[in-house]
Amino acid sequence: LVDTGLLVALHAADYPYHALARHWLARHDGALHTVGSVLAETAWQLPARERARVADFVRRGAVRAHAPDLPGYARMAELLVKYADLDPDWADIELVWLAETSGIRRIATLDRADFGVYRLHGRQRFDIVWPR
């Protein structure tokens, strides 16, 4: 799974983690998965001229974008209530939903504080694989 920080780092050469993100991606051998809200956050953080690159990244199949169905939104509502004290953002909760649905626990995120707390199905920890 990929969170906003990795995608911004890949698309913004002046971002502090740019070289680290490109190096990680060159060595990564699995599919990348994310959610629409992460793509929206990524585009919002890039200059207007660079935003189309995010859509092209998905179009080329470099990352697969997933969207919740109605039961997925119900699960997200449960998670938003459960983690309300952390004030989670929508993208985080959507990624937790995707992890639970897909069984993928590995995540590339700069948000170690929150993803260190979130649990899949209330039990399993995320495996934060980037940055290391």
Sequence positions of predicted segments:
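Alpha-helix/helix-capping structural signal
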Residues: G5-L6, S37, P71, A113
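Short, well-structured N-terminal submotif of metal-dependent ribonuclease cores
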Residues: L1-T34, Q45-D56, H121
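Short active-site oxyanion
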Residues: H28-L32, A62-R64, T101-R106
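Conserved glycosyltransferase catalytic-site signature
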Residues: T4, G36, D89-I93
